[in-house]
């Protein structure tokens, strides 16, 4: 985040490295506010949000006064292809009316609002395929925002991924995030960087596991000596990290 929003103003590479360092502790990402989907939603709100939206949604999100969700993936479409989504938003007067079915919506149980990827143009309408999607901010207490169930994720506890049905969800047009048709671009802005940051988180968790393993090796007594004296154990450590002295 920029310094005016309380961030450090660091670039992409520095943030990627910080994700690796912070991931060494299981609690540091939440402590420092570098946790999905809030961090990704902050980025999108910062780039595409109006000043009113930043005041209403971004600033409380940064302050920890709100939680957010990101709602794009659908049960019948490839989650990695935002152009294939079928959830629609139709303009009626000064409102968007949203209907659709989402799954794997991250942080969906605790969220105060969700950023929802919607199809706002049909196949036969004018416009390039990447300009048919729009992201819309939906407060989770809006009538028709129906959480169906939590979706368990292997190896990931406490993430609150949920399945949601949007049934005639009405929000003001002011909740449109960015210009109409910029939803795909906004998704790529957040998902491209997010994939790298998630990878760096995994690397940080790997280093924590490796360091804990080293600690165990130099303290565990077995068969008349420490594990660090066993050739097989040393070989496994060498294979795992040949560049760091044991």
Residue ranges and their predicted role:
Residues 64-73, 117:
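A short, Trp-centered hydrophobic/proline-enriched beta-strand micro-motif
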Residues 2, 18, 50, 70, ...:
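Buried hydrophobic positions in well-ordered alpha/beta secondary-structure cores of metabolic enzymes
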Residues 14, 140-151, 159-195, 209-231:
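A glycine-rich, basic-preceded beta-loop-alpha segment at the flavin cofactor/substrate interface
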């Amino acid at each position: 985040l920029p310094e005016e929003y309380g961030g450090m103003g660091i670039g992409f590479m520095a943030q990627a490295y910080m994700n690796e360092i912070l991931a060494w502790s299981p609690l540091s990402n939440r402590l420092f506010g570098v946790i999905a989907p809030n961090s990704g939603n902050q980025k999108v709100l910062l780039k595409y949000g109006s000043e009113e939206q930043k005041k209403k949604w971004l600033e409380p999100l940064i302050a920890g006064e709100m939680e957010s969700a990101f709602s794009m993936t659908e049960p019948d479409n490839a989650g990695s292809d935002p152009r294939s989504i079928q959830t629609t938003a139709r303009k009626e007067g000064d409102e968007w009316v949203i209907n659709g079915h989402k799954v794997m919506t991250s942080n969906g149980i605790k969220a105060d609002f969700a950023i929802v990827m919607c199809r706002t143009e049909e196949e036969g309408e004018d416009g390039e395929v990447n300009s048919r999607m729009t992201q819309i901010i939906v407060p989770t207490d809006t009538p028709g925002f129906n959480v169906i169930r939590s979706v368990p994720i292997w190896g990931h506890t406490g993430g609150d991924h949920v399945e949601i049905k949007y049934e005639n969800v009405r929000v003001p047009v002011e909740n449109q995030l960015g210009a109409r048709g910029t939803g795909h671009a906004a998704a790529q802005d957040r998902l491209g960087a997010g994939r790298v940051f998630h990878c760096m988180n995994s690397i940080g968790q790997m280093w924590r596991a490796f360091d804990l393993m080293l600690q165990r090796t130099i303290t565990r007594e077995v068969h008349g000596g420490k594990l660090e004296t066993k050739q097989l154990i040393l070989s496994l450590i060498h294979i795992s990290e040949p560049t760091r002295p044991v």
